[in-house]
Regions:
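Single transmembrane alpha-helix segments in multi-pass membrane proteins
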Residues: 3-55, 60, 77-81, 226, ...
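Loop-to-transmembrane alpha-helix initiation sites
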Residues: 10, 86-87, 136-140, 184, ...
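Short loop segments and helix-boundary regions at transmembrane helix junctions
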Residues: 26-31, 72-116, 122, 207-211, ...
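Alpha-helical transmembrane segments within multi-pass membrane transporters and channels
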Residues: 54-94, 145, 247, 251
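Helix-loop-helix "hairpin" substructures at the membrane interface of multi-pass membrane proteins
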Residues: 70, 133-210
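Transmembrane helix-bundle core of multi-pass membrane transporters
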Residues: 85, 89-92, 96-156, 186, ...
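Cytosolic-side transmembrane-helix boundaries in multi-pass membrane proteins
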Residues: 168-182, 235, 239-242, 254-293
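Transmembrane alpha-helical segments in multi-pass inner-membrane proteins
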Residues: 192-270
């Protein structure tokens, strides 16, 4: 039961980050490496604010805003300064490494015995007895569902449709008299806001911040997105965002099983990268066959 709960907790936390990467990778077709910096940005801010006694719920809003600002800067570097998309993300990711260190004051910042989303008077009063072990899962589930439904709602608005259009065909958006650059910046801001929010929740769940915790975030998020969309492509009754959330949980379940079978945790990043490459290659082969047919 402990293993299942752990998989669900971390799977749903990463699902929020995967929703952000779904925007950049699937909708905008933008290889945004900023997420490797915005995830620990949320964790660093969260840890510092928690230590200062800030309400844990408020940390969610602050970290989302901080991540959105980082994403906006990436967009500005790309759109206004005409830097290539991949390089824009790399520049911002590199800058955020130092920013995160400055915010936290050191490379590792524990927040044990602090009031967090998962350890406060309200949680202790509501989740009593046998229900206490499910408190983390329920709290994370609520936050994940709220973010999923908010993203679904946004994508159904005019701004959301324009975001999709920019990813599909920039020329059409330009012909409508809409600034495609601003639309890209908005998409990158939302995506990195979600990634930062995910880092905030992760830090409070793990009770610490580490400057290297964002390493490989992009690959994990992409793997979650591709696994979810590939596995559930025939489930037409599900929204894509639901598939992404499920994909993140499946990914974490695979990681947990690998560790359970004796795989060293130090090898997981390599295995993730190899699996991700295989998924990408298979996906490209499938698309080529469809075009030939």
């Amino acid at each position: 039961m402990t293993l299942v709960l752990s998989v669900l907790e971390q799977g749903m936390i990463y699902a929020i980050m995967a929703l952000g990467i779904y925007i950049t990778y699937t909708i905008l077709d933008f290889p945004d490496l900023t997420v490797d910096g915005s995830f620990p940005l949320g964790a660093a801010l969260s840890a510092v604010l928690i230590i200062k006694g800030v309400n844990p719920i408020l940390t969610l809003l602050v970290t989302f805003a901080a991540g959105a600002f980082a994403g906006m800067l990436t967009g500005i570097i790309h759109v206004k300064l005409k830097v290539r998309d991949l390089l824009s993300g790399i520049i911002m990711m590199t800058a955020l490494y130092t920013v995160n260190l400055r915010i936290a004051g050191r490379a590792n910042l524990p927040i044990y015995n602090m009031t967090t989303l998962f350890d406060n008077d309200f949680v202790r009063n509501v989740f009593k007895g046998g229900l206490a072990q499910f408190s983390n899962v329920i709290i994370i589930l609520v936050i994940t569902l709220v973010m999923k439904f908010l993203l679904d709602w946004y994508m159904s608005t005019k701004s959301g449709y324009l975001l999709r259009a920019v990813g599909d065909n920039e020329t059409i958006v330009t012909s409508m008299g809409v600034d495609k650059g601003i639309t890209k910046i908005i998409g990158l801001a939302i995506a990195n806001g979600l990634c930062s929010l995910s880092g905030c929740i992760f830090a409070q769940q793990q009770r610490y911040f580490d400057v290297s915790m964002g390493t490989g975030t992009m690959v994990i998020g992409l793997a979650s997105v591709i696994i979810g969309i590939s596995l559930l492509k025939k489930a037409t009754f599900l929204r894509v965002t639901s598939s992404v959330v499920i994909g993140a949980i499946v990914y974490k379940a695979c990681v947990a099983i690998a560790i359970k079978l004796g795989m060293p945790s130090s090898d997981l990043k390599l295995i993730t990268a190899v699996l991700f490459l295989i998924i990408l290659v298979l996906g490209m082969d499938r698309n080529k066959r469809k075009k030939v047919a």
